[in-house]
């Protein structure tokens, strides 16, 4: 199951050239770029591990791409994403976030719906082991 999180998630995975162009777009807007990774891609897990510090004041996406290559070397078996943070007054939030690396076998989730007291509905997400393709 292909995980769909962030921008471009329903498109084919981005190439390094496409990632470079997206990062350059973020830098041209003056956004801080950061790289994060996780082995738990659950949608409610918003706190991924940061790879280094956010990259402020960069002018060229090559610096981000060098850090991405190193992150992939160390954590290539995990999900890696790039985010662009806009610190402009009135925004002050992540403006773009997209996956740039996936593990060889992706996890699957199952949503369990349960009716509880007062006809309230409770949802539980169960993470299943990745399906192995032979």
Curated annotation (Swiss-Prot):
One of its GO terms (molecular function) is ribulose-bisphosphate carboxylase activity. Pfam families: RuBisCO_small. The keyword DNA damage does not apply. It comes from the Bacteria. InterPro entries: RuBisCO_ssu (IPR024681), RuBisCO_ssu_dom (IPR000894), RuBisCO_ssu_sf (IPR036385). Keywords: Calvin cycle, Carbon dioxide fixation. RuBisCO catalyzes two reactions: the carboxylation of D-ribulose 1,5-bisphosphate, the primary event in carbon dioxide fixation, as well as the oxidative fragmentation of the pentose substrate. Both reactions occur simultaneously and in competition at the same active site. Although the small subunit is not catalytic it is essential for maximal activity. The basic functional RuBisCO is composed of a large chain homodimer in a 'head-to-tail' conformation. In form I RuBisCO this homodimer is arranged in a barrel-like tetramer with the small subunits forming a tetrameric 'cap' on each end of the 'barrel'. Heterohexadecamer of 8 large and 8 small subunits. Belongs to the RuBisCO small chain family. This is Ribulose bisphosphate carboxylase small subunit.
